[in-house]
């Protein structure tokens, strides 16, 4: 699992996926989230505006990313 430092209180799920280079664009993030391919803390999440806080774990294509604070 890769730890990803975020410098704000939260980051939206679609922006997080772009930030960690799990997707190539915001459009791809929107589609992948809408199709139920993304998990947040082990549960499928279809809300691209979902707030990701430090401690949350995002999973896509078998890759896991943990958001951590500064």
Positions of the model-derived regions?
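Secondary-structure boundary/capping motif
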Residues: 1, 40-44, 67
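A detector for short, charged/polar N-terminal pre-domain segments
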Residues: 1-11
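A positively charged, amphipathic N-terminal helix/segment that binds anionic biomolecules
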Residues: 3, 57-70
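A basic, amphipathic helix-loop patch mediating RNA/tRNA/ribosome contacts
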Residues: 9, 13-54
């Amino acid at each position: 699992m890769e730890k990803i430092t975020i410098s704000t209180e939260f980051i939206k799920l679609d922006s997080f996926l772009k930030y960690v280079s799990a997707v190539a664009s915001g459009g791809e993030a929107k589609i992948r989230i809408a199709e139920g391919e993304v998990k947040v803390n082990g549960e499928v999440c279809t809300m691209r505006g979902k707030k990701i806080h430090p401690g949350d774990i995002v999973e896509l294509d078998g890759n896991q990313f943990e958001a951590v604070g500064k």
